[in-house]
Amino acid sequence: MGQEKKLALITGAGRGIGKVIALQLAKSGADIALTDLNPELEDLKSELNKLGSKCLDFQVDVTDPEAIDKMVSEVVGSQGRIDILVNNAGITQDNLMMRMKAEQWSKVIDVNLNGVFHITRAVLKTMMKQRSGKIISISSVVGFSGNPG
């Protein structure tokens, strides 16, 4: 990761892929800003601290641009930078599309697409000032293979 310690901001970090990414980046020497809709991030934060990572945690809904802007301001105010953004927050509706309600579809689009837009836009300002940064967006394999009906 180079000489200077990096700061990684990870959405959907509470479990699964986001949690594993947080642990791996901490093992690589990064400090971590965890975000998740679920407020229970204390155990992961403790694990990351044991790995030598400074860790901030935020309960944030990625569909709320004002909450995202506030969180990004807090991260930059505290850490001075954001070097890596991992867009990992996402939801699925376990239903065939032909049975899915419009509200369910709208929620998927709001979290999985609009959420990525909101947080990426908020973080880009900082990365452009730094003249550096990496953005990684996680998506589903279903985007390549599709699902029936």
Model-found features: residue ranges?
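The beta1-alpha1 cofactor-binding region of Rossmann-like NAD(H)/NADP(H)-dependent oxidoreductases
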Residues: 59-71, 102
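Conserved glycine-rich Rossmann-like NAD(P)H-binding loop of the short-chain dehydrogenase/reductase
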Residues: 30-43
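Residue(s) in the substrate-gating loop at a strand-loop-helix junction
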Residues: 140
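Active-site loop immediately N-terminal to the catalytic Tyr-X3-Lys motif
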Residues: 98, 145-149
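Canonical Rossmann dinucleotide-binding motif of NAD(H)/NADP(H)-dependent dehydrogenases/reductases
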Residues: 2-33
